[in-house]
Amino acid sequence: MLRKPNKVKLPEYLITGKLCDGYDFCLVGFLLNETGVPKEVLNKIPNEGYYCYNIDVEDGNIVYNVQEIMEKIYNINQEQLACLMEKNDKYDLMERIDLLQKVLSNHDIKYYL
C-alpha cells in the first residue's frame, strides 16, 4: 500500500519497478512545497499493491529511506549506498539522483522526472 508523506510535498520524481519477490514498488521523491501536490501528479502515483519509499529533500541535503530496498534487491557497494543515504560533500543533489538512476538502470525500472 502506498504510504503518503506526512508533510505536504511536491513529487520531484517517481520510480516504479518490480521487487525480486514479485511485488511492485514505488520510489517517490518529494520536495518540500507549501502549495500541495497537484492532482494530476497524484494520479500518476500507483495505489494499492505497491511499496512506497519516500525520499526527502530539504535545504540541499537529501535523505533516502531506501536502504531496505537497496540491500534487498540491488547489489550495490557500500560507497554507493553511503552516497545515497548520507550527507556527503563529494556528491551534490543532482549527482546523487544521477547515481540512483545508474544503480536502477540495469533493472526493469520506469523513471519519471
What are these language model-derived features?
Residues 1-25, 32-113:
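Domain-length accessory/inserted modules outside core catalytic folds
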